Amino acid sequence: MQVLKTIEELQNIRKNSLGKVGLVPTMGALHNGHISLIKQARNENDIVIVSIFVNPTQFLPGEDLDAYPRRDEADKKICQMCKVNYVFMPEISTMYTKEEVLVKAPNKSYILEGKTRPGHFDGVLQVVLKLFNLTQPTNAYFGKKDAQQLTLIQQMVKNFFLPINIVPCDIVREEDGLALSSRNIYLNPTQRKDALLISKSLYMAGSLISSGERSVKAVKDKIYEVMSILDVEYVAIVDKEFNELETIEPTNTIILVVARFGNTRLLDNIWL
């Protein structure tokens, strides 16, 4: 495994790479969710590149950029264990200049996550496009937990005619159902226990729909009821292009939940 720090190193490697290339973009602090993406990429490609870069442009003022967990040495060991070929770990000054041509996310980026974090998805798309241009992957792997981000990246690839296959990967959970997140380490024991109500509410919603419930309001009300002790930021029921639904479509629905635990935001969802 080789660790790359510069654009020149990465471009030279890519220029001489043959076969399928899989990219797994991350911000580090790798956990079993990331490992599942990396292992899938390893199974489906000749060369696997993992990027580790805490992207400043997707953080808003007052968010946890400086506090975001950084575990570079541990992350490199995980990548080596997963038989990654190249780890790209650039500095901010490598990825950004003072004058930048900007990527503007579409209107759907200003709902849900984007409503709470305006401009967040502009930064996400900016860095992902840079990584795509640098690595020119055959396949790029993203988790379904960040469902709105995944949908916007798919749209960017389509709009910019990028010859890249976006691979959506299932959410990985702890044994008790909590969706894996690098931010879970911020939770105290009480918050960690209460956070289980998020996945519990989603499982319950899925069960209701499996039993024939099609009312968006009825399902939302039940979710809020299960999470009544939590600081719920939003509950949304949308189709897979993030249009609001009047009636639940069992094979074309995503149910999303975000709750706050102090300064920590946790998001989760289920895809039907």
Swiss-Prot record:
Catalytic residue list: 34
One example of a Gene Ontology biological process annotation: pantothenate biosynthetic process
Listed EC numbers: 6.3.2.1
Record-linked Pfam families: Pantoate_ligase
Record's subcellular location: Cytoplasm
Keyword set includes Glycoprotein: no
One GO MF term: pantoate-beta-alanine ligase activity
Keywords annotated in UniProt: ATP-binding, Cytoplasm, Ligase, Nucleotide-binding, Pantothenate biosynthesis
Catalytically driven reaction(s): (R)-pantoate + beta-alanine + ATP = (R)-pantothenate + AMP + diphosphate + H(+)
Main localization, broad class: cytoplasm
Binding site for beta-alanine: 58
UniProt GO cellular component terms: cytosol
Superkingdom assignment: Bacteria
Binding site for (R)-pantoate: 58, 149
Residues annotated for ATP binding in this entry: 27-34, 143-146, 172, 180-183
General function of this protein: Catalyzes the condensation of pantoate with beta-alanine in an ATP-dependent reaction via a pantoyl-adenylate intermediate.
Subunit structure: Homodimer.
Annotated family: Belongs to the pantothenate synthetase family.
Note: The reaction proceeds by a bi uni uni bi ping pong mechanism.
Protein name per the record: Pantothenate synthetase
The species this protein was found in: Aliarcobacter butzleri (strain RM4018) (Arcobacter butzleri)
The gene coding this protein: panC
